[in-house]
């Protein structure tokens, strides 16, 4: 069996990482500006995380959310304090795509609507609704092309106001910094305009 062809592969075999550096099989050192799709924000092989993860896996690698897990409760408590959202609930999942999928689903449960605003060149994942919110027709299968999403130009505040005024928007999904889109940053005005959805129950 071969690996599924997800991306064009660079001819490099990374075998080790430490801090912000990685090494290939030939021992060539690289400064890691990629970070595994920008998800390795803590760097590689940090001794604290290596110790904590090793200890946890040695005791219990995984169990169900249907039993008490004190470690999960500690994470929720600490994250609440750090973020300032102590009155929120933490839903632990495996990936950004799952996070986006469930956020959109919860929004739809809340207001009963089905239309989502996303932005040109956005990337939100490869699962069902997350991929539909991703502005890339080449990875949206016919089964995912359900007309739930309208794509607006990033930083077009007037387009956002007009779309929200229709009254049928379930949610607005936006990246803090677009990665796939070319490191584009929403302006302060654009980010503020997404808060207009609150007045439209979205």
Regions found by a protein language model. Give the residues of each.
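Active-site-adjacent loop/helix segments that line or gate small-molecule/cofactor pockets in enzymes
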Residues: 1-21, 56, 78
């Amino acid at each position: 069996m071969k690996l599924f062809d997800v991306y064009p592969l660079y001819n490099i075999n990374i075998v080790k990482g430490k801090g912000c550096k990685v090494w290939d099989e030939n021992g060539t050192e690289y400064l890691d500006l990629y970070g595994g799709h920008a998800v390795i924000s803590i760097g590689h092989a940090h001794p604290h995380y290596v110790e904590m993860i090793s200890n946890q896996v040695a005791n219990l690698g995984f169990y169900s959310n249907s039993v008490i897990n004190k470690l999960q409760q500690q994470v929720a408590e600490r994250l609440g304090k750090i973020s300032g959202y102590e009155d929120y609930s933490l839903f632990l999942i495996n990936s950004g795509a799952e996070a986006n999928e469930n956020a959109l689903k919860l929004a739809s449960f809340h207001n009963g609507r089905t239309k989502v605003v996303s932005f040109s060149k956005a990337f939100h994942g490869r699962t069902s609704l997350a991929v539909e919110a991703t502005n890339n027709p080449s990875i949206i299968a016919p089964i995912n092309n359900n007309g739930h999403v309208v794509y607006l130009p990033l930083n077009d505040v007037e387009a956002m106001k007009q779309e929200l005024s229709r009254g049928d928007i379930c949610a607005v999904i936006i990246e803090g910094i677009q990665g796939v889109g070319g490191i584009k940053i929403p302006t302060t005005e654009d980010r503020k305009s997404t808060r207009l959805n609150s007045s439209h129950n979205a």
